[in-house]
């Protein structure tokens, strides 16, 4: 315990003592120096800090507001209306970065069109033993086996409730908040865990995510089976509908990329049958694509980043077809450019998310994706993002 406290104090000292350097790099963020971040700053930080310490530092810096507001102005063509809300732009931060709702406002400042917090479990839990995050810089990829490390519902609720009025205004301005729910490792009743999450955090969310696709909690992915999924989602929807007030969040399901054709058909069938509001496609993959170069490529866990990109996009394409384009999809997996985002949108995604790209390219990647996406939309004759959703299926 003493060693953990010492490490925490040391990391806090880095944050405080490094303030001058952080302010300098903040200036570079404001001026959009993508090259500096990708070629010098991010590799330098990775040499200094192990992946989990770097993650903690990033969350802390963002939560303190040390990074300036992005100056890029979202044009009307980037606006999307979906899930009962307006999204100023379609690029969000995926769950996993801000697991405990500590850095929401700082993330909006970077230019994200929406923020997803979590995964949050009912009770606090440590997650899996360290080390549990591994960089594959040669592949622009990460393997993680965090295992739903979480401060728990009570702490996250308190944190988000303190900014509830601020979030209400942000949502009205086109910057919604999503909350990703998980189950505790030792829980024997998954449905009860997710239901508790809905009751506790539902009133604070614009959308909720039922995460049944993390590969790092034993037995979790089995909840994607047709019978199990129907039971779980029926309970979740019942709890959502029972929430007091008129502000009831949309309910989405986050699925894995490692599914059989039958699995995908079953998920689509259950989603249509129960009236699920949306799908998040996809989580990390347990597969290891041929050609990975990173020395740590054989580590156990979920793989994210560039090697996941095409598998994720293909799964989006299939789920859009299986749901006849009637269930909105948030596409995630390997997005680091406007081209990546547009490919997912044309495959059927209404919105996209990124996370791993931040690790290797830094905060400027958010504006880069939006700027490139806008240029590509114009180049290909689309007047809005909405016009491009599912365009591949209309050819």
Curated annotation (Swiss-Prot):
Reaction(s) catalysed (UniProt annotation): (S)-dihydroorotate + a quinone = orotate + a quinol
**What residues does FMN bind to?**
95-99, 119, 180, 211, 254, 282, 305, 334, 355-356
Look up the transit peptide and give its residue range: 1-10
**Note accompanying the cofactor annotation:** Binds 1 FMN per subunit.
Q: What is its main location?
A: mitochondrion
Segments on the Mitochondrial intermembrane side according to the record's topology features:
1-10
* TM segment ranges: 11-30
Q: PROSITE patterns under this entry?
A: DHODEHASE_1, DHODEHASE_2
Instruction: Give binding positions for substrate.
Output: 99, 144-148, 211-216, 283-284
InterPro entries per UniProt: Aldolase_TIM, DHO_dehydrogenase, Dihydroorotate_DH_2, Dihydroorotate_DH_cat, Dihydroorotate_DH_CS
EC? 1.3.5.2
Describe which pathway this protein belongs to, using the record's wording.
Answer: Pyrimidine metabolism; UMP biosynthesis via de novo pathway; orotate from (S)-dihydroorotate (quinone route): step 1/1
Catalytic residues identified in the record: 214 (nucleophile)
Q: Where in the cell is it found?
A: Mitochondrion inner membrane
Task: Mention one GO molecular function.
Answer: quinone binding
Q: How does it sit in the membrane?
A: Single-pass membrane protein
Residues in the Mitochondrial matrix compartment per record:
31-395
Q: Which domain of life is it from?
A: Eukaryota
Q: How would you describe the post-translational modification of this protein?
A: The uncleaved transit peptide is required for mitochondrial targeting and proper membrane integration.
Q: Which UniProt keywords apply?
A: Flavoprotein, FMN, Membrane, Mitochondrion, Mitochondrion inner membrane, Oxidoreductase, Pyrimidine biosynthesis, Transit peptide, Transmembrane, Transmembrane helix
Q: What cofactor does this chain's UniProt record say it requires?
A: FMN
Under the heading HAMAP family, the entry gives: DHO_dh_type2
Q: Its function?
A: Catalyzes the conversion of dihydroorotate to orotate with quinone as electron acceptor. Required for UMP biosynthesis via de novo pathway.
Q: How does it assemble?
A: Monomer.
Question: Family assignment?
Answer: Belongs to the dihydroorotate dehydrogenase family. Type 2 subfamily.
Q: What is this protein called?
A: Dihydroorotate dehydrogenase (quinone), mitochondrial
Annotated gene: Dhodh
């Amino acid at each position: 315990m003493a060693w953990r406290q010492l490490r925490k104090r040391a990391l806090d000292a880095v944050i405080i003592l490094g303030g001058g350097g952080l302010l300098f790099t903040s200036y570079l963020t404001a001026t959009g120096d993508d090259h500096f971040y990708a070629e010098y700053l991010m590799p330098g930080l990775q040499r200094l800090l192990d992946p989990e310490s770097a993650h903690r530092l990033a969350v802390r810096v963002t939560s303190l507001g040390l990074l300036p507001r992005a100056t890029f102005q979202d044009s009307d063509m980037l606006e999307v209306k979906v899930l009962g809300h307006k999204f100023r732009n379609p690029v969000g931060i995926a769950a996993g970065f801000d697991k405990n709702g500590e850095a929401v406002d700082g993330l909006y400042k970077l230019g994200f069109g929406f923020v997803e917090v979590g995964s949050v479990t009912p009770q606090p839990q440590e997650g899996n033993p360290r080390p549990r995050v591994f960089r594959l810089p040669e592949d622009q990829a990460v393997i993680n086996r965090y295992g739903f490390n979480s401060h728990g519902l009570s702490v996250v609720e308190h944190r988000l409730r303190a900014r509830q009025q601020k979030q209400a205004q942000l949502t009205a301005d086109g910057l919604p908040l999503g909350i990703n729910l998980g189950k505790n490792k030792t829980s024997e009743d998954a449905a009860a865990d997710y239901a508790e999450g809905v009751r506790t955090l539902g009133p604070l969310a614009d959308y909720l995510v039922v995460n049944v696709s993390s590969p790092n909690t034993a037995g979790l992915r089995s909840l994607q089976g047709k019978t199990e999924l129907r039971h779980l989602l029926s309970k979740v929807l019942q709890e959502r509908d029972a929430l007091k007030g008129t502000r009831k969040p949309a309910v989405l399901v986050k699925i894995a990329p490692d599914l059989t054709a039958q699995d995908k058909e079953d998920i689509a069938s259950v989603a249509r049958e129960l009236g699920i509001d949306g799908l998040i496609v996809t989580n990390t993959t347990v597969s290891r694509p041929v050609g990975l170069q990173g020395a740590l490529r054989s580590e156990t866990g979920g793989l994210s980043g560039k090697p996941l990109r095409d598998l994720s996009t293909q799964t989006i394409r299939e789920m859009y077809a299986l749901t006849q384009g009637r269930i909105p999809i948030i596409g995630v997996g390997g997005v680091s450019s406007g081209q990546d985002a547009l490919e997912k949108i044309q495959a059927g995604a209404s919105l996209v998310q990124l996370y791993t790209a931040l690790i290797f390219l830094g905060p400027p990647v958010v504006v880069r994706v939006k700027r490139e996406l806008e240029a590509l939309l114009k180049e290909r004759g689309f007047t809005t993002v909405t016009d491009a959703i599912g365009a591949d299926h209309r050819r």
